[in-house]
Amino acid sequence: MPANLTEGSFHANQTVPMLDSSPVACTEIVTFTEALEAEEWGSFYSSFKTEQLITLWVLFVFTIVGNSVVLFSTWRRKRKSRMTFFVTQLAITDSFTGLINILTDIIWRFTGDFMAPDLVCRIVRYLQVVLLYASTYVLVSLSIDRYHAIVYPMKFLQGAEKQAKVLIGIAWSLSFLFSIPTLIIFGKRTLSNGEVQCWALWPDDSYWTPYMTIVAFLVYFIPLTIISVIYGLVIRTIWIKSKAHETVISNCSDGELCCSYNRGLISKAKIKAIKYSIVIILAFICCWSPYFLFDMLDNFNLLPDTKERFYASVIIQNLPALNSAINPLIYCIFSGSLCSPCKVQRSQDSRMTYRERSERHEMQILSKPEFI
């Protein structure tokens, strides 16, 4: 049985629970009666379970290996920075997602029933939801950090390291706080079809829809709105500063004035950090948007109970797990030192002045996302 975080109670018509790797999931796919009466549905469901296991194993390996490489890469850096800190936090969150969400889902599919005590059920569900919130709120913290770095660069330099730790501390604190209801809602339970599962213990099925709506807004819609507004302001600031730079350069005849103004421009390192952050956010949106939209439609019974819905749901439910496997790849693309050999150009260094070598060395360091 999968490690669904939002599996609801069985309805009157009895439903076959869905197989998914995500910590939150739609509560049903096809009715239990349909699964018994239609042989093709039953065989399809069983065969796809094997394919799902293969998919989950692949995602698990890529998630653990990829994020381990990222953590090792950030750990071996002698020079740390705010961006190193946030990349590390994101990799830690993704690693725990692989261990607690994906791996437990794989184990559940092998065992069928939930074998552990009720306390273990509640703790596992709680940790799964904590990671669900944390994966989103860490991205919000990263967005706020990038906003201050671009919009208020002078203020940002004062206590930047402390501010980054405070943002991450708030993100994890809110994640643990908002997940507390899970300890009450979920528990070990015998379902109507005889299975013993770690399931939602609702007094009535009508509680499920408002609960899932609240979770969807706290985990996805509200954070996505905040992130979108923040990066909108960041892009606007970059555009305004670039236009001001063009105006000054076109009207400037004094070299010293131009040089002093250039120092106030946004560095290439910060621009690259923004690009890295935006790609991470876009990956999050691509992986989670189909899931939450499908889940909301399903909880309000707006989707038809058809085989096409079954096909779509099985694919969509694996997308959140895919996000944790993609993030290390994005880091690899933006960090040349991780994925390509370092080329030291000694001959060029010998022809450069001390100032040119210093500036190039600084840009080589700052151009990597972990040092921005």
Swiss-Prot record:
Known glycosylation sites: 4, 13
In the UniProt record, does the keyword Glycoprotein occur?
Answer: yes
Segment forming the signal sequence: none
A Gene Ontology biological process annotation? negative regulation of defecation
Tree of life domain: Eukaryota
- Which pairs of Cys residues are joined through disulfide bonds in the record? 121-198
Q: Which Pfam families match?
A: 7tm_1 (PF00001)
Keyword check for Transmembrane, yes or no: yes
Q: What does the UniProt entry say about where the protein is found?
A: Cell membrane
The membrane spanning regions, by residue number, are: 53-73, 83-103, 123-143, 166-186, 214-234, 277-297, 314-334
Record-stated family: Belongs to the G-protein coupled receptor 1 family. Vasopressin/oxytocin receptor subfamily.
Cited function = G-protein coupled receptor for neuropeptide S (NPS). Promotes mobilization of intracellular Ca(2+) stores. Inhibits cell growth in response to NPS binding. Involved in pathogenesis of asthma and other IgE-mediated diseases.
What this protein is called in its record is: Neuropeptide S receptor
